[in-house]
Amino acid sequence: MAGNQGNYREKPTRNEKNYKKANGQPRLKEKSSRAKSDNVCPYAKKCGGCDYQGVEYKEQLKTKQAYMKKLLKPFCFVEPIVGMKNPLYYRHKVHAAFDCTRRGQIVAGAYRKNTHDVVDIESCMIEEQESDEIIKDIKDMLRSFRIKTYDEDTGYGLLRHVLVRKGYATGQIMVVLVLASPILPSKNNFVKALRKKHPNITTVVLNVNDKKTSMVLGDRNITLYGKGFIEDKLCGCTFRISPSSFYQVNPVQTELLYEKAIHEAHLTGKERVIDAYCGTGTIGIIAAKNAGEVIGVELNRDAIRDAVTNAKRNDIRNIRFYNDDAGKFMVEMAQKGEKADVVIMDPPRTGSDEAFLSSVVKLSPERVVYVSCGPETLARDLKYLTKHGYAVKRATPYDCFPYTEHIETVVLLCR
């Protein structure tokens, strides 16, 4: 989902549950036989975040496989979906909204479906456990430090959200306190008390969001402890993660997903590769180890800065990044008579658009590797590409978000 890096567009529930199917497609859970599972969350009815609550994991995979097979039947063979050995506690980015009830109880958790009412959640079955414990302890610390939660209606109060990000390979932890003001009373003592409870915390950042907005993060970050970022390793490379950086929430499946994407590119060390919607450069940097040259293109300026930093951090010298619209960039390449052997595209859930897809056709790479997080928009985009000279060779679904309807897919297209 490299096109979604940067700030949040709206206040999400903990697993981005409000994803709606396009074109009237039936919801996946309606296709499931709903075989019962012992993994039933006590907050399920209030939160509504997990579409497959109480459904055995094997049944979830079976349902998703059948759905993708039917959806992509006009285009190609669909390989067996790649699931997880342990589908619990996989989210390494945890967001909690904070509020105070009419009775004065401080609550922290997810928004109730289709509302801004906060469901108080102490432990979520799909979230990294230490992150949940940190959020719980922050909630318990607020009264002793006289920190009030922010009220959306009145604009009164201080703490709006807490974001915890943890590196899967490194174990580094970043805590982001989203406040309505840059002033946190007794900030040094607060950080000291929090680190005493959780000494594994690597950095604490104060993010200032002083606007009446549905965005979670503001534009200004103040580092209270540590470097203001953490690092994690993926496919042998090290990546910097700052408060607003896009970085996949399920590192176990992401590594498998990216390895498949690089494999499908069939790189021999000579190819010129375009990493479109490159985000913070993860796929492109990994691909650069086996390519002749990689060009990363991304519209988000902050993401490009992170991408350049990540390339330097990994001593990757055969990659260049451009802060530009990927479609426009490739059209200009084609007009100049330039070529690319492979295009790797990782668009947001809304998919690509005709302007970008037409630029792919004009540039005419031998192979296109499409990394999708939206099945219906994937099918739509494949329809366009197959009408313009490309053949879909195969598709491999990945279950990066167990207990939800979301499906990621790697697709190979060739001329």
Model-derived segments and spans:
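Nucleotide donor/acceptor-binding cores
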Residues: 92, 171-173, 270-271
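Short, aliphatic-rich beta-strand segments
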Residues: 99, 164, 171-180, 238-242, ...
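Short, solvent-exposed loop/turn elements at beta->coil junctions and helix N-caps
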Residues: 80-87, 152-153, 161, 165, ...
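Short, acidic/hydrophobic/Gly-rich beta-strand patch recurrent on exposed beta strands
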Residues: 109-112, 176-178, 307
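Short helix/loop segment immediately N-terminal to the Walker
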Residues: 149-156, 273
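Extended interfacial segments that mediate partner engagement and assembly in macromolecular machines
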Residues: 35-39, 48-149, 169, 184
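Accessory substrate-recognition/RNA-binding modules or partner subunits associated with SAM-dependent
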Residues: 120-122, 126, 131, 135, ...
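Rossmann-like S-adenosyl-L-methionine
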Residues: 2-31, 186-188, 192-415
